[in-house]
């Protein structure tokens, strides 16, 4: 049998010149690394789009490595399962409001199970001038 883990491709940053700018999402990504969180499960979206870039381009998609999920609920459940199997805490990023509401059951399950999950959330662009047409107005 082939080892399937050797065929998994991890997203890696494309080398670019050093940036003159410092982003707030880089600070959040650095904090996740300082906490020694190996993975962060998230459902990608506009709420925290800068964090995606910082995890890949600032941290090289290592510690934490992004695990893309189809739903906020899945992200918390995956983090809970990882913590149970490895005895290490994992992060889950949730969209504010609806994402948090969708994830309430796995958050409750983790609490009942006394399994640590590091949860962060985001709200997206607050400044109306920085919102994209239509999608960030609903």
Feature annotation, model-predicted:
Residues 2-138:
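N-terminal alpha/beta PP-like core and its mobile active-site loop of ThDP/TPP-dependent enzymes
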């Amino acid at each position: 049998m082939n080892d399937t883990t050797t065929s998994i491709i991890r997203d890696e940053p494309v080398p670019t010149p050093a940036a003159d700018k410092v982003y707030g999402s880089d600070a959040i990504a650095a904090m996740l690394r300082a906490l020694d969180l190996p993975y962060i499960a998230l459902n990608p979206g506009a709420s925290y789009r800068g964090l995606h870039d910082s995890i890949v381009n600032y941290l090289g998609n290592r510690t934490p490595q992004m695990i893309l999920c189809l739903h906020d609920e899945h992200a918390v459940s995956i983090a809970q399962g990882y913590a149970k199997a490895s005895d290490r805490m994992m992060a889950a990023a949730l969209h504010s409001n609806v994402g948090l509401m969708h994830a309430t059951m796995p958050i409750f399950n983790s609490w009942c199970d006394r399994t640590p999950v590091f949860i962060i959330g985001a709200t997206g662009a607050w400044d109306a001038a920085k919102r994209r047409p239509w999608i960030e107005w609903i």
